[in-house]
Swiss-Prot record:
GO-annotated biological processes: urea catabolic process
The reaction(s) this protein catalyses: urea + 2 H2O + H(+) = hydrogencarbonate + 2 NH4(+)
Compartmental location: Cytoplasm
EC code(s) of this entry: 3.5.1.5
Temperature dependence per UniProt: Optimum temperature is 55 degrees Celsius.
Source organism per UniProt: Staphylococcus saprophyticus subsp. saprophyticus (strain ATCC 15305 / DSM 20229 / NCIMB 8711 / NCTC 7292 / S-41)
Protein name: Urease subunit beta
Pathway involvement of the protein, from the record: Nitrogen metabolism; urea degradation; CO(2) and NH(3) from urea (urease route): step 1/1
Entry superkingdom: Bacteria
């Protein structure tokens, strides 16, 4: 053993062990590749990605930190998502949440044939200092 050397077990590393998983089919309907990072709120991913948004609310990809999933134009693949843990607050991304994760804020558009889920405008409140800024 060398000074500072770390010897680790030669076993499989399980990421997000104990988290409930959700599997979604995702299709890139756009004309450009799209990459989604490991901790990106999947609900707020690029609008060219077609998937069940309601099931993605409050969840991120079940992949190691720093990794990403790439969707080429026309690609359709299955992804596994896990819920955010900790305080369960999300800020940034597209600004759709900017606060606590609350599934009651998600609703289906009744007059839209694609049944895309969105967050009601009156529910887009922010707890941060930049509230109301671009």
């Amino acid at each position: 053993m060398k000074p500072g050397e770390i010897i680790v077990k030669r076993t499989e590393i399980e990421v997000n062990q104990g988290h409930n998983a959700t599997i979604l089919n995702v299709k890139n309907t756009g004309d450009r590749p799209i990459q989604v990072g490991s901790h990106y709120h999947f609900f707020e991913a690029n609008p060219a990605l077609q998937f069940d948004h309601e099931k993605a609310y409050g969840k991120r990809l079940d992949i190691p930190a720093g990794a990403a999933v790439r969707f080429e134009p026309g690609d359709e693949k299955e992804v596994q998502l896990v819920e955010y843990s900790g305080k369960r607050k999300i800020y940034g991304f597209h600004g759709d949440v900017n606060g606590s994760i609350d599934e009651s804020r998600v609703y289906k558009l009744e007059d839209d044939s694609t049944a895309t889920e969105v967050i009601a405008e009156q529910d887009k409140t922010s707890e941060n200092a930049n509230k109301g800024r671009g």
